[in-house]
């Protein structure tokens, strides 16, 4: 009888783990992408949805990279922190600049640089960091369908971000608040990446819950 009570208590209080955090990060990215689509559909140009998208991607990378941190060498840790700082600067500085000095000379220079091919190179560290984080996380346990989806979701988002910048460079006349973001292939791929990761993470959460329930169930 006591064993049954203890088992039911353990099932009633599930523990939150990295997979739950990964699911939350991907859902944040999905919410930011849909918010951005809605803003443009209504004819509103706002940077807040972009910040939510960036935070969702950075959080997903962070969860993948920091899980199993003890197994990473000191050199890898140093390289990761340096790359993470660079990626955070690349992704968040445009938002800060847009909010603090939207009409400044620095903002004008930044916008001009953003329309050059050299700007595409700035996004390569994002793909590199996302790929390394996914590879590290996949190496912590046997690779299954849900783990592969959860890890590759943010890699798809990173690659789609480069494609998005390239698309805007090659379609300069199709920019503005009224542009239908839902019709843009890069934006569709960004949403697909977040959804892929969210589905994989959700499958992992459900699988972990079933395993916990099986272990907690009384054998008699």
Q: Where do the language-model regions lie?
A:
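Membrane-interfacial loop-to-transmembrane alpha-helix junctions, especially the N-terminal start
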Residues: 14-26, 72-86, 142-155, 217-219
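An N-terminal structural lobe/cap that precedes and organizes the functional/catalytic core
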Residues: 19, 147-148, 158, 162, ...
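Small-residue hotspots
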Residues: 24-26, 32, 56, 86-87, ...
């Amino acid at each position: 009888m006591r064993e049954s009570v203890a088992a039911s208590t353990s099932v009633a209080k599930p523990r939150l783990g990295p997979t739950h955090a990964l699911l939350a990060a991907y859902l944040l990215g999905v919410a930011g992408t849909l918010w951005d689509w809605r803003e443009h559909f209504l004819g509103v140009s706002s940077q807040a949805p972009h910040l939510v998208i960036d935070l969702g991607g950075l959080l997903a990378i962070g969860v993948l990279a920091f899980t199993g941190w003890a197994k990473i060498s000191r050199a890898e840790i140093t390289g990761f922190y340096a790359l993470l700082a660079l990626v955070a600067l690349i992704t968040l500085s445009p938002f800060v600049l847009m909010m603090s000095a939207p009409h400044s000379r620095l903002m004008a220079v930044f916008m001009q640089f953003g329309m050059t091919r050299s700007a595409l190179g700035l996004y390569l560290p994002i793909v590199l960091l996302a790929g390394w984080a996914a590879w590290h996380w996949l190496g912590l346990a046997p690779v299954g369908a849900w783990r592969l989806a959860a890890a590759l979701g943010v890699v798809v988002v990173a690659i789609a971000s480069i494609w998005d910048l390239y698309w805007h460079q090659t379609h300069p006349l199709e920019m503005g608040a009224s542009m239908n973001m839902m019709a843009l292939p890069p934006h569709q791929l960004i949403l697909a990446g977040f959804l892929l990761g969210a589905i994989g993470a959700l499958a992992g959460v459900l699988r972990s819950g079933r395993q916990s329930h099986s272990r907690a169930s009384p054998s008699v």
